[in-house]
């Protein structure tokens, strides 16, 4: 047996937050300090300064709780928690599911009767999965299994056009030359990055927790990125399904805050009104922690169309976006500083300090209506999920308060969770083992809370990172933008969603797991869905099907209904399946596994 989970030191030194709560606000050439008094109840001076600095934004007034509706849903799901991780393709995590090699890492043996997936194999033999995609792949390299000691890999190229080129007209045969971006000649440090790395995959000995959730709940093998491209479009799509109506704001022009500028690498296809499509990574304008805590002056993104938060606010449904590192660690002349860091470790060694908060991963900070530029805390814990000065944007620590009922807090109807960067699975600053710590710890906490019986947890990803996936994306919305360089994958298909260019999709396949008492156990759904299906479920469950103009929600598949991941026509299974956050092994709640450690050591193939 190779390196096991107990041999991997998991030293994590989370730098303490400095409880400033809000920032010093720069206005009229002077910084205004935020005191304890106006953090608890934002002062008129603070409100005026923020309004001047961020046109269109105002600190929301606290809305009476009597207006909120907590009971009206179309399904038994009263609470949705979306864990939105980073940069993994389906084949990269589940290409050989449910077969694990069991030569290293946490042992894994699938339950009898586990369904096969649309993966890298044609059949599974006693010696393992076999098929031409594994041994005679049309790409320059065959896929190779990654061991647990190789969990920390390099980051691949996951920009819009390189992903299109990798798909090569649907042949899926040009990944190495288009999305592989790190090889030993470039220097990889502690990251594992041999030639052909973009083709490689993990199995249940490393992504053990996710495989065990698939064993006990439901997983899709037919979920796609709403559009080709990186994290920011993915984040916008999971919260609105519409990346158009955006523009780049000049962060260097303090005399006219928010004035439009150009950023061809992030915002394209500008119309006569100066707005276009956000198709690349760009930090949000309504965020004092953008541009490396305002130590640089790169353009920042603004969105003018509504998102799901706007719709939930109109319907008086509680919601929140919870992100690691959102609480400011200090202030500078530009306002809030999100400087907290955590130690990334690999194979028992400290690798690097990773900043926890990544602004361009927070989609609600692009809209004046849903932003919290100064990272203000809620006026009290009871206000979590309700409209007040925090405007539904919170540090991750507040999610634990909501689950536990600390200070009278309650769990919002809809919660999006973005882990701190070292635990978000993004190659280069995280890995599957760090991700597992966050996911399993969070799911365990939800499963053991008073909300579990009416909750659905979705685990999915913002983009594929450019990792190989053999499934040809079903492109239903095209784009023909010569300035960007769209390929025939997109130019051969008309625009069917809205009217903007550079929203070509669906993109490559992503993992999508639902954990809930209302899933079938050990179920694989092949019903086609995409990232915006999350938005569609929220609209259908809480908003009577109300949709967002120009959104993919009009064409996205449902995660419930016939063939879906949620099934309300079968008896719910309330007993939670509790996993070990470090190993991913089942520790309670699954009768088949029983004494899982003993079973799996003796039942390896």
Residue ranges of model-derived segments:
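Secretory targeting and sorting signals
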Residues: 10-38
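N-terminal pro-sequences and low-complexity stem/linker regions of secreted or lumenal proteins
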Residues: 36-605
